Amino acid sequence: MLSLRHCPKSARSALCSRPPGVPKPRISYPSLQRSLSTQSTEDYDVVIIGGGPAGLALAAGLGTNAITSRLKVALIEASSLGKVRNWMEAPGQYSNRVSSLTNESVAFIQSTGSWEYVDTSRVCPLEAMQVWDGISDARIHFSPSDLARLPTTGAIPDSMAIMTENLNLQRGLLKRLDSVPNVKLLDTTKVEDIQNDAGENNSWPIVHTSTGQSLRSRLLIGADGFNSPVRKFAGIESSGWAYDTHAVVATLFHPYRDKHATLAHLEQPNSTAFQRFLTTGPIACLPLTSTASSLVWSTTPLIASTLKAAPPATLAIFINAAFRLPNAALQNLYSILLSAHQKETPLSPEAARAEVQQAEIAYSVLPHDARASADIDSLTKGVLPEGSNLLPPLVIGIQDKSIAGFPLKYSHAETYIGTGRGARTVLVGDAAHTVHPLAGQGLNMGLSDIRELVACLGNAISTGSDIGSYTALLPYMRARYMSNQSLLLATDSLHKVYGTDAAPIVWARSTGLEIINELSAIKGALMGVAGASPGNVGTSWWNAAATGIEGLAGAGDVLRAVGGGLKDAITKTGSNIVQGGVNALKNSRR
């Protein structure tokens, strides 16, 4: 069970006590290098640093809320927001950076009036999810119907989430902000320095920009990513580590799957997310349209760089194989791929296809089996093989220039609120935390931060409080810190548990996955508290889930080897957090 001992000491202090009276001696700040008299200084109630999805959503939330809309707000972004506002892909082309927005997140965006500016022809409802073990093939399936057995505050949604390109969301938010009078957007403007007004504790921060303008703010909000200047100014430390894992992303193309075709029960529309946990990292295929999907393949840095350097057709062959072939076959394919790369003779599509075909023969995969992918021409014609709905559609092409990669990391700020000479600052989104993408919750975490912060500031205004004071911001910290910590720890644990092929661990995690897949109450709780249901989730969800668990004698003992507290994991990890100690959930009712 997650407890306060998992958090940094300063976070525990913030969550349990009043604000500290003196600044921490370890925090240091640069001295002012320029004369303020040479620059104009303008006062704002709120200054937001960062114009990504989180920063724009925060600006929209503040600018459209009935209470906070009276605040004078500025948003500073280093890049050009004009490019985002005018973004337009060619027909059939898609950005390689996409997000899965939970129904809760969509509801928040809708509440700001921004969703009507999102191009809904470029969004895809996520109607189901298939997650399975790359060694044992133990599987769990999620769909909105799993919510039907649980108490909710509203109707069961038709979809679990909405897939959309990040740029589509950003453009919609920008268009909404065009009609919000009290929010000023300052793009192509870099933050040169952040200083205290007169260098005093609790004084207003002053942001000096590359354009020569200075902005003094009652509250400075960092929505400025992992390398947050606001966090550095506030002297807030962040703990974490880099994973020995990189993510490869790309836009994939598939044959059309007509759900109204003859033998429709064998055909499926492209509205299911697929994720397979390989020992080198999870691979996910996320639907965009009936014929396009987004790839997120987390693997070792060496394999990632080799896949990116390979011909796109070779990468497509490896993607199909990674979802279908046994672990031993994949390890052999990796060796062949790396060997060819080291010899500076990248593996050709023809050679890659031949190797996959040999692997299929070696592991008794028949030519028209759902697990086959070598003879792609015959597999994409006629009636699909039985079991095709359990696997993503075959990749027949990759969008030009869509292949990219980036390192993965875990981080969590020790607090979200600045104190002392770093006072009147608060962090949201990636400035406060970064998470492994296997849970698909990074942006949703940030939007949850923003929703709580807007509510917190609205309450401060309603009670006549100073919106930049520690006490006014503390409810936001208390609402979000432990929630985010739960998700971060559970996701990190999943990454580690599925990164081994040790037989006892494989057996334990596979047994747990199969047990939970048979319990709709548990699956519904996983989805409900992850935001699949826009209604509030209360203790009744846990009671329903625990009731289902108690009928399963010995399940807690079976899963204890995996460790962790399922209730904490479920609470914030969402549909991918399917491992943990079921016994902890049983005990939570006692």
Which residue stretches match the model-derived regions?
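N-terminal mitochondrial targeting presequence
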Residues: M1-E42, R589-R590
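Beta1/beta-strand and adjacent pyrophosphate-binding region of the FAD-binding site
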Residues: T38-A54, A74
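Glycine-rich FAD pyrophosphate-binding loop
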Residues: V47-I49, G63-R97
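N-terminal FAD cofactor-binding segment of flavoenzymes
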Residues: G61, R85-S136
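Central beta-strand plus flanking loop segment that forms part of the substrate or channel wall
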Residues: S114, N227-F274, T279-P282, T289-S294, ...
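Conserved N-terminal helical subregion
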Residues: S121-A234, S239-T251
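FAD/FMN-dependent oxidoreductases across multiple families
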Residues: A310-G468
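C-terminal helical "tail/cap" subdomain of flavin- and related membrane-associated enzymes
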Residues: P393, A455-R590
